[in-house]
Design a protein with these regions (language model features):
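Ribosome large-subunit tunnel/peptidyl-transferase-proximal elements
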Residues: 2-38
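A short linear-motif detector with a strong N-terminal bias
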Residues: 2-3, 21-23, 45-47, 66-71
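A short, structure-level motif marking secondary-structure boundaries and short turns
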Residues: 15-16, 40-43, 91
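Amphipathic coiled-coil/heptad-repeat helices and related helical stalk/stem segments
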Residues: 26-27, 52, 72
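Fold-independent oxyanion-binding glycine-rich loops
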Residues: 27, 46, 92-93
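Short, flexible micro-motifs
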Residues: 29, 40, 80, 84
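N-terminal positively charged helical leader segments and presequences
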Residues: 32-58, 64
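Short basic, glycine-rich beta-strand/loop surfaces that mediate nucleic-acid
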Residues: 58-93
């Protein structure tokens, strides 16, 4: 199975998608979800530190999980139901 990475041109539809799923937030929790097979899709913030996003992106390739990019950390955090920014999140349902 091939991994599909993309930067979306329809940011709002991706953020709506995030908000409709149960998610884990943060690099450490996301890595655990990938390793356990619970992650269904990963979301990364464009303005997040590449030191955080690049290893997660590599893990997505390793585990054959789609990876979508969202406009910024604050929007990703809000879509996940938290009031602070998030560099990474994963849909787990």
């Amino acid at each position: 199975m091939e991994t599909h990475k993309f930067r979306t041109t329809d940011d709002q539809s991706i953020l709506n998608e995030v908000s409709q799923h149960k998610t884990v937030v943060g690099a450490k929790q996301l890595r655990k979800a990938l390793q356990s097979g619970r992650a269904k899709r990963v979301y990364l913030a464009v303005n997040a530190d590449p030191a955080i996003t690049e290893p997660i992106e590599a893990m997505c390739e390793q585990y054959h999980i789609d990876c979508a990019w969202v406009p910024n950390m604050l929007d990703l955090g809000k879509a996940c139901g938290i009031e602070v920014g998030a560099a990474a999140a994963a849909a787990i349902d």
